[in-house]
């Protein structure tokens, strides 16, 4: 086990110190050995070889717009303040190799090159491979310090410097996006308040701006001090699933999502991360994530619906969020 700059070997008490030291030496040697990067299979210019994949949503554009209108009706009735609605972009791999397409790792390298993010993840689960380019931290625990960084508010990057600056400024000044962000900040303050010391929950950053290859995001930071009798699992139980990808209030928002979305989300909007023996934890929100399974792959995209949401704008925002992944694939998007 490697923790920051330390290497620890564990074993049964009956084991000897000599055996433990031998394991440490073996692991240290492996860590110091240069690793050759995986070679990209021939013919992998596109996923599965051949023509670029063509993605198509699991719902018609008009049906998604209607779902947004239904969500707004629930908001107007006072059921919720915000609902995060999504749809799934799906494509077929023309010539899949063994193990979910066989080209997942080169694709992940390409995805990271096109869209560098702080919380990427590659999970080969055998029948399913998950390639995540998430920009969003869900929960981090270091000692007693807890941090969550919800993203709410998105604009596409501009094609020129002037257009890009206009997008950036427009997001920063958008009352709608700031209201969306603030709702989720309040929700997460409440979630952290269940497990943190009284009076320790703070918002050191409100409405910060982060730029990525294809989008601008409005990001806030909420922190707290975990109560000493609690641990990482207690923190996860109090906060999962993330408020930024469900809505507010969380449980009613999830009930509406269950009604309006035709498919279960799977790994999308869950969390990927690690928990260490020291109690440290870091997790991401599973967004901007491609899932490969057999001869199929899919990318789920969504956005927050509030009282003054425009259905057309909400739909366009979902596509902007998926653009980095689609660009990495050289993919085409077929709307219907």
Where does each model-flagged region fall?
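Extended alpha-helical targeting/anchoring segments
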Residues: 4-336
